[in-house]
Structures are given as C-alpha cells and as structure tokens.
A protein has these predicted regions:
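Conserved glycine-rich
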Residues: 150-152
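Short conserved segment of the HATPase_c
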Residues: 110-123
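Acidic ATP/Mg2+-coordinating residue in the GHKL
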Residues: 105
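Short helix-loop "hinge" at the ATP-lid/N-box region of the Bergerat-fold HATPase_c
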Residues: 73-75
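Conserved DHp (HisKA) dimerization/phosphotransfer helix of two-component histidine kinases, i.e.
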Residues: 1-37
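Short conserved segments within the C-terminal catalytic ATPase subdomain
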Residues: 37-47
C-alpha cells in the first residue's frame, strides 16, 4: 500500500490521458464516491448541490482519487452520528471559475499545526496516528493531483465545528 501511494505521489502513475469532462458528470462521480465511502462506514452524508455547467480538462482517475482521499479523511474524523456534508458548486475564486467540491466533517477540526502541514508528505498529525493505516500521504496526493489539473486543495476549520476541505478544479471557458 505504502509503495503504491509513493508511486502516485511521485508521478509513476501517469498513464491516464487528459480528457474533457462535463462538470455535471464529475459532480455525479463525486456524489457516488462520497455515498459509497460514507455507506461503508455507516456515516450519514448530506448533499448541497447547485446546477453545474461547463467542462473541466482533467485526468478523471487522479481527480477521483483526490476526492476519495478527502472524503475518506472526513468520514474518519467526523462525529459518526452527525456524518459529513458535501457541497458541489461552481465558484469564482481569484478571478477564475472552478468546480468546487467541499467536504465538512463534525470532528475536532484541524489543529494549528494541521492547518500548516496537513497537505505535506508524511505529515499525519498527532503521534497517536502513527500506525499502518496513516502514512500521511492522502492529502499530499490530493493536493498534487488537483494542482496538476489546474486546481487546488484548501482546508479550514468550520466556524461552528469540525473541519472543511475544499477541492477546486479549474473549468474551461465555453
């Protein structure tokens, strides 16, 4: 597992071709993945979604893996009874239009150190998480994949409680 994650991180998995994908199709893929991950852990998921238009030029496999990493982290850290909230929308950020996929959990949120280092390779937060299941690569890989597609990964603490991770994928002008 760790070797596979390292190969993904360092670009040894580049066989997939870039393609034009509608934002509506990507939204459905993101929704389906979030439902599957949440259902596997018996965690409720609430969706807030806008009508999406336009296209993104991306490698769907890596973008999907980035999304699954983000959702898996949220499911792992949330209050299991409250679940997660997924928001899918179009957004203009710094003058560029993006397909934005946001996941909010209801856990303890990010520590100050997490906010600085969470997307860095091999960072896994507190010492209690240094085990076989946490290699500190998930958010680093998600950030790398999104950046390669002209996007970005941002994370915050929600004003009320929990963490919020935002995946932005640049849309094409139509």
């Amino acid at each position: 597992y760790l070797e596979h994650m390292r190969q993904l991180l360092y670009g040894h998995d580049r066989a997939e071709e870039t393609e034009v994908v509608t934002c509506a199709r990507l939204k459905e893929q993101f929704k389906e993945a979030a439902m599957q991950i949440a259902a596997a852990e018996k965690v409720p998921v609430v969706f807030h979604e806008d009508s999406l238009c336009g296209n993104v030029c991306c490698k769907p496999g890596p973008v999907g893996r980035a999304w699954k990493n983000v959702v898996s982290n949220a499911v792992e850290h949330t209050d299991r009874a409250r679940g997660i909230v997924v928001r899918l929308q179009m957004e203009v950020y710094e003058g560029q239009e993006y397909l934005t996929a946001t996941v909010r959990d209801f856990g303890k949120g990010f520590s100050e150190q997490d906010l600085i280092y969470a997307d860095q390779e091999f960072y896994s937060g507190d010492a209690s998480r240094h085990d076989r299941t946490h290699q500190g690569l998930g958010l680093a890989i998600a950030k790398k994949f999104l950046k390669e597609q002209g996007g970005m990964l941002c994370f915050y603490n929600h004003a009320e409680s929990g963490a919020e991770v935002v995946c932005r994928i640049k849309t094409e002008k139509t």
